[in-house]
Structures are given as structure tokens and as C-alpha cells.
């Protein structure tokens, strides 16, 4: 051992060294020297002195201690975390025996601890005279700096939230969607039930690990001494203790050992013969992904946007038109989960319980043709989404990190619910061909499917011809209600992709009555939006009932659904929105003839200042005649 001339810790180190064991892993460092507290003893110690020395161990952990090799010298296997507890007084004395106002108790035996005399004004070393253990005391100020509140796991958070505030029932979600979306009652019921079951699946699947851990702890056999140690540990614990891995001021060596102990305490999954011998097993609820299909402007995206506002889980809306296969220019498939992680504020545990809405999924349908060697934006994207829909671990780039650095976060999509939607233009023609197939000789069908583009072209050609709009809508809705998986496969979706979307929900087209309701009834309706625009210029907008029906008929003829309403309103109100600002117009009236283009919108103007002054003067003169008559009579 090297000597220290002016250092005050030399005597303390020498005293500790004389009462040590024959091996240890650490030492006391001070200034210019490093004195091993429990080092391998050579010939420097007398053998008789070593036999007379009591059995002691030393721990440098601020809030825990760990015996050497994780076990006591009596073989009781006490490698758990311990703390030095304080008595009634908060202020710790320096160099006192601990019998006054400051009382530090040993976490192993509960006996009083005494401070080690080191000729220093303040010491953090205490020892227990009964079990001969040394400890490092962490002050209250240091504990506030070092002890950080450990975030509870996502499973505990979900379980606690489920107990305190149960998930909204499907009827409540349905009523909320009804305030913003008109019609589509079947689709709203399916989404409401799917969201509610998603909450229940999270509550059922994730806390199962906690229950298994509790059962494993109960089955662990403990000796009476270990039970006594645990009882005293709970009795004298004075603060919440922190997992020491990675934050110990003395390094990560002790933290690594603690992490290994935690990993050993985690319940292990049953393997091999244990699965065969087990008599019962927990039911794991699997997810049912949803596919929404319907004409454009029927409310598919609006349903998703409205649903995202009322959920307590992360919700991400992703556009499939920009996705490409890995290695090509465009967005990677992992960007779908990256958006979900961003919505969860980069909380991985929370993102693994979210909902992903895949919009425009029909645009990734494969296009048949021998001229195309590789469909990177169609079938390649579907193949990349297969494991994502079923459940896999996705490597998502970290926040503020480039892709080339390789800094990724692993996200498990097993409990992520996927809702896909698409217009699927021409799908009704494919269903019609399937239902009206005519067979030639040897069972060969006369009308073979030609894929997505041929079906869409046939549907567009049918729209261009003159036909009854109401009959076309009814026929299309009737056919979509009979959609099957083989129709989607003929459209261009691969069978593996269709099989991972078991719930298929067709949305019906919007009729005239529904379009009139969309104009006025929802909270974010079209007519109230334009009325708010005119009210900013201190002007009113009045639209008659006949005008609303005429606007709905125009939208039906355009066959663009509810999106056609806004374009019609923009065209009708272009001139009024140009004339009203900085004018005397106080009201704009729109009737049926204005919608049909037979006349211009009507304006109601405020009276000018000169006319109002003349009317006021004439009114004063008229009021003056009775006064003069009364004065004359009096």
C-alpha cells in the first residue's frame, strides 16, 4: 500500500484495511493515491490479526448495498438491494456515535450504525457493529439529484387507466362520430366496436406479463432469513429506490450486476416440455384488421380523422400512394410506424398500442402485364406490409437521426391495429362479372378479369355515358355489399395481403338527402363554414332549402361525393366574396335560381349615412308637430 503524506484518508484506509477480508473488488480513492479497501491480502497482514478480525463487507452504493458475490458470508444468499435508513432526525452528525438525534439503522439486522472516524469534518461511511457491514450514506440533497422517478411501464399505465377510467363503450364512440359524419352507420358501428375491442385487447394481453411475474415471485422459495431481511428492508426504507444501472456515481460495475439480478427475476416463457406439461394457458386476444372500401367522397378519411380526436391511444394516418419497396426512391414502409411513433411523442411502449390508418390502399394494387418486370410501388409494397400487419419488430429511425447512421428504435406491431381504406374504382364491375359469368365449353369463363386498370377504365366509360344517377348508385352499393376476397385479388391485391384484413366494410354512396344533411347538420358543416367567413366581414349568408337540394343534385351529377359540395359552393359564392369586403352589403341571399345559373346572388345593402340623416331629421320634424300643438293648447 502506498503512503499518503498530507492526505487525511490514510488513517481511515489503514483502519479499514486491517478489518477487511482477503478479497474485494473496490477501493477508496482520494487525491493522489488509490487504497484498496478490500484487496487481496499478501504477507503484509499478520495471520493472527487476520483470524482475530471480524467478518465484514463493504458497499459503496448510495441507496443500495450488495454483498460480495451477491451472497452473505453465512450463505443465506442475500444479494438484494438494501438501504441505510434514518431515524427521526434529518440532519446527520459528523463523527458521532449515532446515539443522539441522528440514528442510522442497518438494513440487514436493524441495529444502529456508527460513523467511521476518519479525521474528516464530515464522513459518509458508517458501519454496523452487529453484522460488521460498512455502508455509504447518501445525503438528502444528493438523493434529490440522483434519484429520478422511474416511469411506470406501459402495461401498468394501461391497467391503471383501465381501472380509473374505463374505455368508452361502442355506443358513445358511435354517437361522437355521428356528430361529425353523416350516414355510414354500418361503418361507424364497425369502427366503434373495433376501437373498443382494441382497448380490451391491450388490457388483456399486456398485463398478463405482470400476472406471470407475480405468480413467479410467489412460487420462489425463500429461507426464513431472507424473509426477515425483506421485512426489515420494507420497514426501514426511507425513500423510493432507483434502479442503479447506468446512474451510479461510482461506475456501472454494480449497476450491471443489479441489471442481471433484475433480468433473472423476470418471468421466463415456458419452453419445450413445460408447455406440454402445463394444464392451462392464458388466452391471448388477436387483432382483427379492417378494410374500408367505398366510392370517393363517402367519408372514409373523415371517419379516421374524427376518430383520432377521441382516442387515448396514438393514431397515425398514412398515405400509401408515396410508399415504395425498400431500395427505391420514395418513402419506406417503416415510415408508417415512424408516424405512429411520432404521434406517441417517441414513447415506444405507447406506440406499440396505437392504431394505424392506411389511406388510399387501393393505389398499391398490382398491375398485370408482361412489360413490367418489377412493381415497386404496388405488389412490392404489399409484400413489405405483410409482416407489419401480422405483427413483427420494425426498426424505426430514432428522433433527429439520419438513416445512414443506423440509429434505430425497435417497435413491435403485434398489438397495433391497422385500418385500411380505398375507393377501389371498378370493383363493382369485377363483382358483376363474377355474379354473371357465362361458361363456354370445358368450363372456361367467357369474361376473364383484366385487373385494376381495366376495371377502372370500364367504370369510367360507364360514367361518361348517359344513365340514371340514382339507379347507378343503388346498383353499385348492391354489388359492393357482396364483395369477396377473390374480387379484391382480381382487382390487384395479393392473397396474403387480403387474408390479413379479415373485416371488410363497404361504404354506401351518398344520396341527395344525405348531401343536404352534410351541408347543414354536422358540427363542421359546409354552409356554417361559409357563414363564418361572411360574418368576419359583418355580412350574413342565407341559403334557401330549395338551393340546398339543387346543390346536392349537382354534386350527385359530378359523382365526386361530398367533395363536390365545396367546389360548387366556391363557384357560387365567388362573386359575393369579391363584392362584400369593404362594402355596405349586410346580407347575401342564394336561392334555387342562383344555383341553376339563372340569376346572380341577391344583396341587401345597409342605408347610406345621408339617407339616414334625412330620415332622422324628418322624424324629428314629425315629432315636433305634436309638441307645438300641445304648447298652443296649454
Curated annotation (Swiss-Prot):
Residues 70-84, 599-611 have a biased composition (Basic and acidic residues). PROSITE patterns: CLPX_ZB (PS51902). It holds the Pfam family AAA_2. The keyword Metal-binding applies. ATP binds at residues 295-302. Signal peptide: none annotated. Residues 69-102, 599-634 are annotated as: Disordered. GO terms for biological process: ATP metabolic process; proteolysis involved in protein catabolic process. Residues 1-56 form a transit peptide. Its EC number is 3.6.4.10. Its main location: mitochondrion. Homohexamer that forms a ring structure; this hexamerization requires ATP binding. Component of the ClpXP complex formed by the assembly of two CLPP heptameric rings with two CLPX hexameric rings, giving rise to a symmetrical structure with two central CLPP rings flanked by a CLPX ring at either end of the complex. Interacts with TFAM. This is ATP-dependent clpX-like chaperone, mitochondrial. It comes from Mus musculus. The lineage of its organism: Eukaryota, Metazoa, Chordata, Craniata, Vertebrata.
Amino acid at each position: 500500500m502506498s503512503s499518503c503524506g498530507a492526505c487525511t484518508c490514510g488513517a481511515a484506509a489503514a483502519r479499514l484495511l486491517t478489518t477487511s477480508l482477503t478479497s474485494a473488488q473496490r477501493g477508496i480513492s482520494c487525491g493522489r493515491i488509490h487504497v484498496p479497501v478490500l484487496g487481496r491480502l499478501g504477507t503484509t497482514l499478520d495471520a493472527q490479526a487476520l483470524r482475530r478480525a471480524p467478518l465484514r463487507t463493504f458497499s459503496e452504493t448510495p441507496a443500495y448495498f450488495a454483498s460480495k458475490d451477491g451472497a452473505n458470508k453465512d450463505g443465506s444468499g442475500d444479494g438484494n438491494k438494501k438501504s441505510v435508513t434514518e431515524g427521526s432526525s434529518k440532519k446527520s452528525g459528523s463523527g458521532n456515535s449515532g446515539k443522539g438525534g441522528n440514528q442510522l439503522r442497518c438494513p440487514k439486522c436493524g441495529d444502529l450504525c456508527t460513523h467511521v472516524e476518519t479525521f474528516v469534518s464530515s464522513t459518509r461511511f458508517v458501519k454496523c457493529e452487529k453484522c460488521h457491514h460498512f455502508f455509504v450514506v447518501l445525503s438528502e440533497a444528493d438523493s434529490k439529484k440522483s434519484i429520478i422517478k422511474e416511469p411506470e411501464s406501459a402495461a401498468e399505465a394501461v391497467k391503471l387507466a383501465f381501472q380509473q377510467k374505463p374505455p368508452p363503450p361502442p355506443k358513445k364512440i358511435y354517437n361522437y362520430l355521428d356528430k361529425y359524419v353523416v350516414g355510414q352507420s354500418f361503418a361507424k358501428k364497425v369502427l366503434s366496436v373495433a376501437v373498443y375491442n382494441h382497448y380490451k385487447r391491450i388490457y388483456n394481453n399486456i398485463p398478463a406479463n405482470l400476472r406471470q411475474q407475480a405468480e413467479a415471485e410467489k412460487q420462489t422459495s425463500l429461507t426464513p432469513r431472507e424473509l426477515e431481511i425483506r421485512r426489515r428492508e420494507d420497514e426501514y426504507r426511507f425513500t423510493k429506490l432507483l434502479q442503479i444501472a447506468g446512474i451510479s456515481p461510482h461506475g456501472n460495475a454494480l449497476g450491471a450486476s443489479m441489471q442481471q439480478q433484475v433480468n433473472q427475476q423476470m418471468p421466463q416463457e415456458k419452453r419445450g416440455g413445460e408447455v406440454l406439461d402445463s394444464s392451462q394457458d392464458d388466452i391471448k386476444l388477436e387483432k382483427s384488421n379492417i378494410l374500408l372500401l367505398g366510392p370517393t367522397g363517402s367519408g372514409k378519411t373523415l371517419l379516421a380523422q374524427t376518430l383520432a380526436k377521441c382516442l387515448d391511444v396514438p393514431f397515425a394516418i398514412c398515405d400509401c400512394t408515396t410508399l415504395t419497396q425498400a431500395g427505391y426512391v420514395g418513402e419506406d414502409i417503416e415510415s408508417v410506424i415512424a408516424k405512429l411513433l411520432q404521434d406517441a411523442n417517441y414513447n415506444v411502449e405507447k406506440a406499440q398500442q396505437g392504431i394505424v390508418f392506411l389511406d388510399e390502399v387501393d393505389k398499391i394494387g398490382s398491375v398485370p402485364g408482361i412489360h413490367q418486370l418489377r412493381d415497386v410501388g404496388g405488389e412490392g409494397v404489399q409484400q413489405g406490409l405483410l409482416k407489419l400487419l401480422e405483427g413483427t419488430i420494425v426498426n424505426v429511425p430514432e428522433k433527429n437521426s439520419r438513416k445512414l447512421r443506423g440509429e434505430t428504435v425497435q417497435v413491435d406491431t403485434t398489438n397495433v391495429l391497422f385500418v385500411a381504406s380505398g375507393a377501389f374504382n371498378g370493383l363493382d364491375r369485377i363483382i358483376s362479372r363474377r355474379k354473371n359469368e357465362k361458361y363456354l365449353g370445358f368450363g372456361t369463363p367467357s369474361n376473364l378479369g383484366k385487373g385494376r386498370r381495366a376495371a377502372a377504365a370500364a367504370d369510367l366509360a360507364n360514367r361518361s355515358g348517359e344513365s340514371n344517377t340514382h339507379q347507378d348508385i343503388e346498383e353499385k352499393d348492391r354489388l359492393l355489399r357482396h364483395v369477396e376476397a377473390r374480387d379484391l385479388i382480381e382487382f390487384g391485391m395479393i392473397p396474403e395481403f387480403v387474408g390479413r384484413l379479415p373485416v371488410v366494410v363497404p361504404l354506401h354512396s351518398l344520396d341527395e338527402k344525405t348531401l343536404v344533411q352534410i351541408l347543414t347538420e354536422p358540427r363542421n358543416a359546409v354552409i356554417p363554414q361559409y357563414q363564418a367567413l361572411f360574418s368576419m366581414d359583418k355580412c350574413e349568408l342565407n341559403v334557401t332549402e330549395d338551393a340546398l337540394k339543387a346543390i346536392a343534385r349537382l354534386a350527385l351529377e359530378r359523382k365526386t361525393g361530398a367533395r363536390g359540395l365545396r367546389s360548387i359552393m366556391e363557384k357560387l359564392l365567388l362573386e359575393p366574396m369579391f363584392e362584400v369586403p369593404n362594402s355596405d352589403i349586410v346580407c347575401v341571399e342564394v336561392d334555387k335560381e342562383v344555383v341553376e345559373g339563372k340569376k346572380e346572388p341577391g344583396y341587401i345593402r345597409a342605408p347610406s349615412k345621408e339617407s339616414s340623416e334625412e330620415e332622422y331629421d324628418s322624424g324629428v320634424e314629425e315629432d315636433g308637430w305634436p309638441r307645438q300643438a300641445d304648447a298652443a293648447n296649454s
